[in-house]
């Protein structure tokens, strides 16, 4: 009985750490963002807000991200994905242990076309490090935004809900 409790607690701890590594411990969204939208409305993130959050006891880092749903399109297939964009200050340390091939993207002040994808997505679409693909994002207008990305790395959390 003691072994099963310890195993259960260890598994629970590992799942929590994986979710935290990819999604953070706390997420702050614009109040106007609703669940049915395919992306979040940007939060007006000024320096005072950043400083106030950073000064809270226990806060290690504050990361700005952008999220959007879209379609990955290759020459032979496509798949829907949840896209997460980061800036040049993003801290890759928490997810470093999940990178199984390649490198993290080189992010600078300019728009980057480099991306990491999950092993699960790479297998489904027959993609590997160095390959390129198109990503289609919906916009408020009738036309879609199309961007081309190059895969610099592949990760695997071992947790299908995160890798899908």
Question: At which residue positions do the language-model features occur?
Answer:
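Active-site/binding-pocket entry motifs
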Residues: 34, 88-90, 157
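Hydrophobic, regular-secondary-structure patches
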Residues: 6-82, 106-110
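Hydrophobic secondary-structure segments that place a key small or acidic residue at a functional site
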Residues: 66, 81-86, 103-164
